[in-house]
Amino acid sequence: MAFQIPRGTQDVLPGDSEKWQYVEHIARSLCSRYGYQEIRTPIFEHTELFLRGVGDTTDIVQKEMYTFEDKGGRALTLRPEGTAPVVRAFVEHKLYGSPNQPLKLYYSGPMFRYERPEAGRFRQFVQFGVEALGSSDPAIDAEVMALAMHIYEALGLKRIRLVINSLGDLDSRRAHREALVRHFSNRIHELCPDCQTRLHTNPLRILDCKKDRDHELMATAPSILDYLNDESRAYFEKVKQYLTALGIPFVIDARLVRGLDYYNHTTFEIMSEAEGFGAAATLCGGGRYNGLVQEIGGPETPGIGFALSIERLLAALDAEGVELPVESGLDCYVVAVGERAKDEAVRLVYALRRSGLRVDQDYLGRKLKAQLKAADRLGASFVAIIGDEELERQEAAVKHMASGEQTNVPLGELAHFLHERIGKEE
């Protein structure tokens, strides 16, 4: 029986994995530059965490979670998103007592959602995200959005736009909720079955519906921006002011509500405008969640963050034709001709690697010509050939693969020679 990977998953093979490493390196480096530290949480949590943290009326909780019972009868769930686990760790380890407030964290790892697989979307996907906990300053909202944009721009994406909205505080959302119920109630039969249920549980979710997004009722639905109280309106104005001061262009979409229940005040998405990327062009989403820490059992603590899918980021790079400057190939391939030379090659390869070079050798007992072909396939910049004659002179015949230029180099000087030549090439 030939086994295949489960639907909605993928293997990342050599040649592609280097792109993943590069993208993750850029994201991590920028987070460090902005003062964010890494946090790592388990890939499964108690199911109740997501019921409370994500919201039991959300599509994620109702339709998409991978939930199971362990041998101890505990209900556990493979994490569908990263914010609730980070907040759980924040509360459990009493990080709210840290003098370094706000606490700025980033994470990266696999998430799991049972949804229909499509281009750039998987049932297991890698999410990179940040969370800033402990500040309700609108300047940190702008910082989080600036960091997200910086990651995409540093990777070479140009056809992206930042879309923002405000959901306001609790009073603003309550007034907007009542207006939505009045708006949709008389024509509820025109909505999809899910939205008919949402009208009574969480009417704001109707605005996030993919099935009814083009319905005339959506276009005429009450705007949350018309229901912001003075405090919420002033907060949103300050966020926009900071973004403008940073020179970050944005557009406002009053229907941007995001798919999780914990958001309030600022919400945002980064969209791809690349041709052929598809209708679902959201690359990144985030927002403020001032009540989530309390909901999970901690003290009242404001927070804001974002999450992006590495898979969708790579798809956007492909759509824009961006070539990542990933390292590939070897610095040197050591070719051994004869058993005595093989013994020396093993020692030499180890020494060259210890000096910081990318080096490999033959392990299949191939002839000289076959080893040279292998070096070429592996993208080696140089080949160091050792045979009986070279051993007698304690030298290697070093060939530059691109030019064909060949020179004899003492074995004790080979590492220095390669570092010098490769440094000049770079």
Curated annotation (Swiss-Prot):
Keywords of this entry: Aminoacyl-tRNA synthetase, ATP-binding, Cytoplasm, Ligase, Nucleotide-binding, Protein biosynthesis
Q: Which Gene Ontology biological process is one annotated for this entry?
A: histidyl-tRNA aminoacylation
**Which domain of life, per UniProt?**
Bacteria
Give the catalytic activity: tRNA(His) + L-histidine + ATP = L-histidyl-tRNA(His) + AMP + diphosphate + H(+)
Query: One GO term of the cellular component aspect?
Result: cytoplasm
Main EC class the enzyme belongs to: ligase
Q: What is its EC number?
A: 6.1.1.21
Q: Does the keyword Ribonucleoprotein apply?
A: no
Where it sits in the cell: the answer is: Cytoplasm
**Family indicated by similarity:** Belongs to the class-II aminoacyl-tRNA synthetase family.
Q: Which HAMAP family match?
A: His_tRNA_synth (MF_00127)
Q: Which NCBIfam families match?
A: hisS
Assembly information from the UniProt record? Homodimer.
Identification of the protein by name: Histidine--tRNA ligase
In its UniProt entry, the species of origin is given as Geobacillus kaustophilus (strain HTA426)
Its gene is: hisS
